[in-house]
Curated annotation (Swiss-Prot):
This is Bifunctional protein GlmU. It comes from Salmonella typhi. CDD domains: GT2_GlmU_N_bac, LbH_GlmU_C. The keyword Heme does not apply. Residues 1-229 are annotated as: Pyrophosphorylase. It holds the Pfam family Hexapep. Residues 251-456 are annotated as: N-acetyltransferase. PROSITE patterns: HEXAPEP_TRANSFERASES (PS00101). Its main location: cytoplasm. Catalyzes the last two sequential reactions in the de novo biosynthetic pathway for UDP-N-acetylglucosamine (UDP-GlcNAc). The C-terminal domain catalyzes the transfer of acetyl group from acetyl coenzyme A to glucosamine-1-phosphate (GlcN-1-P) to produce N-acetylglucosamine-1-phosphate (GlcNAc-1-P), which is converted into UDP-GlcNAc by the transfer of uridine 5-monophosphate (from uridine 5-triphosphate), a reaction catalyzed by the N-terminal domain. In the N-terminal section; belongs to the N-acetylglucosamine-1-phosphate uridyltransferase family.
Length: 456
């Protein structure tokens, strides 16, 4: 039966010794964000009125990283078991709300599974998430009597007969706040580990005649926890395979789904093609018929219709209008903007710069803090000299300008419409419309000159 109010407790106090890291275990990333953030996001989407985060090791780093004003931080100074962790959070529970218990190192739990668990929770009882494993070694076993759940026995406390049970406890459960506080107050540490097990509340509820409803997740991987980097890497591949499958089924052509990483949110138009070893980070939008070449990294960017990004290009915090072409080996840094039909070629870098409609920067160029008009040609080796060691300055280039190769534009400087900058020129003053500008050292010819010969 579904109550109108629900809060979530996320257990995240473990040190994660087997990660061999100074970083708290739950802050290790999966798909580009901390494991615990995945769990917080699921709780938020589920409609949690309050999220209580039980922390211990690395608490300050957790707070600095998560920076969520809506979290209620609950300290577990000593790690004395899951029951003890829940006891620390219990004073914050309202009697008339449901409490859902989650884990910061179980990052793939889905909102859909949690919603089914919430819906299945009996009035006055417990909703319990369980799975069946071929090899349940090390897990708490679900005990039943006449089909009804009667309790959970931890592996170290189980008899040989109980160890044959394949249904195991995932640790995820939901119960009423008042009931949970009562059961938590009755927990003891009379077990092999000397800890307070949250699982003991199942037997307490059964003894009171309360119903325990067991629910299975859509996928077993949803309940897989992380204790070491190998397990984390396996969950990463599971997650990425699921994302790739969703994209393929929605019409996106991934040339090699096993070599695609989504570390954020991707919105795609029709007939998008993505080659191998592409990484998508943050919020990325790809318009219709966009093609992304192998080895590209796209982060927090909008790519317009019919754009093509050639292999090994990096695009970050950039905006491309329709029919732009990028790369190979191009880099668009934050603030780069390409208007329709613009081209940025190999080994070109842009930062806080706008390239106008139909304009081209073909090779070996740096455009920083620049505003470039339409139909401009930027020759190879052009550099906007935007930094004087203390401050940044802007370069403005009008429409229909031709900039020859190996040109330096020393900002602040403006080049008027239709101007031509000869190859090898250093521009230090403003250029008027339709002017030709050139600066070169005299060319010297020495007839009969002999090249030096190496001494033997």
């Amino acid at each position: 039966m579904l109550n109108s109010a629900m809060s979530v407790v996320i257990l995240a106090a473990g040190k994660g010794t087997r990660m061999y890291s100074d970083i708290p275990k739950v802050l290790h990333t999966l798909a580009g964000k901390p494991m615990v953030q995945h769990v917080i996001d699921a709780a938020t989407k589920l409609g949690a009125a309050q999220v209580h985060l039980v922390y211990g090791h690395g608490g300050e780093l957790l707070k600095q990283t998560l920076k969520d004003d809506k979290l209620n931080w609950v300290l577990q100074a000593e790690q004395l078991g899951t029951g003890h962790a829940m006891q620390q959070a219990a004073p914050f529970f309202s009697d008339d709300e449901d409490i859902l218990m989650l884990y910061g190192d179980v990052p793939l739990i889905s909102v859909e599974t949690l919603q089914r668990l919430r819906d299945a929770k009996p009035q006055g009882g417990i909703g319990l998430l369980t799975v069946k494993l071929d090899d349940p070694s090390g897990y708490g076993r679900i005990t039943r009597e006449n089909g009804k759940v009667t309790g959970i026995v931890e592996h170290k406390d189980a008899t040989d007969e109980q160890r044959q049970i394949q249904e195991i406890n995932t640790g995820i459960l939901i119960a009423n706040g008042a009931d949970l506080k009562r059961w938590l107050s009755k927990l003891t540490n009379n077990n092999a580990q000397g800890e307070y097990y949250i699982t003991d509340i199942i037997a307490l509820a059964y003894q009171e005649g309360r119903e325990i409803a067991a629910v299975h997740p859509a996928r077993i991987s949803e309940t897989d926890g992380v204790n070491n980097r190998l397990q984390l890497s396996r969950l990463e591949r599971i997650y990425q395979a699921e994302q790739a499958e969703k994209l393929l089924l929605s019409g996106v052509m991934l040339r090699d789904p096993a070599r695609f990483d989504l570390r954020g949110t991707l919105y795609c138009g029709m007939d998008v093609e993505i080659d191998a070893n592409v990484i998508i980070e943050g919020y990325v939008t790809l318009g219709h018929r966009v093609k992304i070449g192998a080895g590209c990294i796209i982060k927090n960017s909008v790519i317009g219709d019919d754009c093509e990004i050639s292999p090994y290009s990096v695009v970050e915090d950039a905006h491309l209008e329709a029919a732009c072409t990028i790369g190979p080996f191009a880099r668009l840094r934050p603030g780069a903007e390409l208007l329709a039909g613009a081209h940025v070629g190999n080994f070109v870098e842009m930062k806080k710069a706008r390239l106008g409609k139909g304009s081209k920067a073909g090779h070996l160029t740096y455009l920083g803090d620049a505003e470039i008009g339409d139909n401009v040609n930027i020759g190879a080796g052009t550099i906007t000299c935007n930094y004087d060691g203390a401050n940044k300055f802007k370069t403005v280039i009008g429409d229909d300008v031709f900039v020859g190769s190996d040109t330096q534009l020393v900002a602040p400087v403006t080049v008027g419409k239709g101007a031509t900058i000869a190859a090898g020129t250093t521009v230090t003053r403003n250029v008027a419309d339709n002017e030709l500008v050139l600066s070169r050292v005299p060319q010297v010819h020495k007839q009969g000159w002999q090249r030096p010969v190496k001494k033997k």
